[in-house]
Amino acid sequence: MLKQRREKQQQMELVIMEQMVPEDHFLRKVDRAVDFSFIYDLCAPLYCADNGRPAIDPEILFRMLLVGYLYGIKSEARLEEEINYNIAYKWFCGLDLTDKAPDATTISQNRRRRFRDNNIAEEIFNEILRQCMAKGLVGGAILYTDSTHIKAKANKHKKKLVEVAVTPKAYLSELDAQVDQERKELGKKPFDRDDEAHKGGGSATRMQSTTDPESGQQSRDGKPNGFYYSEHRTVDSKRNVIVNVHVEAANINDVTPMPEILDEVERRLGKLPKYMGLDAGYHNAWIAHLLETKGIQGVIGYRRHTHKGAHYGKYRFRYDPDRDEYICPEKQRLTWKTTTREGYRQYCCEGKTCKGCPRRAECFGASMNRKVVERHVWQDALERVDAFTKTHRGKRIYGWRKETIERSFAEAKENHGLRYARMLGIRNMREQCFLTAAVQNIKRLVASFYRAF
């Protein structure tokens, strides 16, 4: 028989909060698997020990933030509301059933004032990583690094053209020394390097967002146009634990921060990996040389030849490493003549040899009198990387990228709100990236904790 309840009776009930949160709830698992006591040690210097009004427990604040990142709750006002209505969230944050969650402005004011000039988010990430390492979740032998773009909280139409300082590239001094040495071997004078590119102090024009000036305009092929940040992430192959996070504006080339990334990885893990997997965006001679000097075997995606000109590309010429010469399609040898300021060796024949060649029109333009082929001074390192990548082991290591770094980024964007920046400025972007990586590593800790039983 159909029955409709027309009025609700008010009644008092005695409830035990512990019984209202299921034993298999994910937040219960997090509470068992992760030791959060380190938060007090991190925050102690930021609070007065014996004076002032009692503050909100910092562990409650950070547990609230972790709930927001775990469940993709982007707004702090929405987070406050969800915690007030969700018993499991309240239980995890250490609140009683009738306690109100700290106000959203409490979190934002703590961020702006108390936590502004320190790296609390990074330290939380570091501690979670240390717990992962203590549980044996980080192998450290094979790492993968890649970057992903994160849309800044900025309108792409609100922008202006500004002049910015140009920083000399990190590898210039090492490259210059090698170029000078090679020119000396050829009996040529070293280059004068008093230009702005080497001394610093040069400038260039860039499009800058008026809403978030620290973001960078992205205008690469195959990427969305607008203002973005780039997160450079490094993950371990064993359990897909994130071991490093590095944030830059999106107009910084992916290869530029690689020396800093390697230093950060070594500082966090205490060692460098044996292998490092990178996609084709890192396929250049400097990266291969950098990895080789650090004792790391690079496994880098190969870039296909994209030469579409009317004349022969470099790939039509075969390199002879024993004689350090190139051999053209007509079996003529191109010898090393000089090394350019940019670090490229130039190989060519005598002018009369090219002038009488039957393939001259297809080989080079009418304004030139001979074909010139260039080879970077660090090209040998890149070719050794390519040779290893084509081996059976190299192919297996590179193939794991989609299961590690690509999966890690997909998880962060789909489940934890990393597709968009939550706040303005690179400092807030770093906080978002570090806390997102921390909750992803917490999920690995939970999986490991329950796998052990």
Language model features by range: what are they?
Residues 38, 69-72, 87, 91:
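Short alpha-helix boundary/capping elements
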Residues 60-68, 74, 79:
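N-terminal catalytic cores of NTP/NDP-binding nucleotidyl/phosphoryl-transfer enzymes
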Residues 18-20, 53, 223:
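Short secondary-structure boundary/capping segments within folded domains
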Residues 16, 34-38, 94, 161, ...:
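Short, solvent-exposed coil/turn linker segments
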Residues 23-66, 376-377, 381:
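Basic, short loop/linker segments at the boundary and entry of helix-turn-helix/winged-helix-like folds
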Residues 1-28:
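Hydrophobic alpha-helical membrane-insertion signals
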Residues 50, 92, 423:
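Short glycine/serine/threonine-biased micro-segments
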Residues 3-4, 72-85, 95-453:
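Anion-binding and metal-coordination hotspots
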